[in-house]
Amino acid sequence: MECPKCQGNMEEVTYGRNMTVDRCSNCKGIWFDVGEAEVLKGKWMSEFVDSGDPEMGKEFNKIVDVDCPRCGKKMDKIADPKQSHIWYEACQEHGMYFDAGEFTDYKYETLLDKFRDLITGKRS
């Protein structure tokens, strides 16, 4: 599979015995098949799959038109409802893509995230 952001090679990374995600060997973005990100979010030490540089991830997050690596359709850019500063790409049929550093941020909702929501309010 090819990375939807930098067209690098996606390599399989295994968490535990039965969960495999795809991580780009170049930009370290991560592809999660449908449901995998939500499952891994609750697992101990699952952030190890997110080994990329968050600063590099911020640069790749600026890319707007991103195609699903499974079907080639344009993915939606979605803000996490609990942490509105996190934007990821999602294909309703196949999964979601996080830039380097985003999954770790997605996993850990901090006090600062809750404060941001109070200040900025919820998106409609």
Listing of model-derived features with the role each one plays in the protein:
Residues 13-16, 34-37, 78-81, 101-102:
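Short Cys/His-rich "knuckle" micro-motifs
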Residues 51-100:
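Short, solvent-exposed interaction modules
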Residues 44-57, 108-123:
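Short amphipathic alpha-helical linker/capping segments at the junctions of internal repeats
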Residues 9-12, 30-33, 74-77, 97:
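Secreted/processed peptides and extracellular or luminal domains of membrane proteins
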Residues 1-22:
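The feature marks the first
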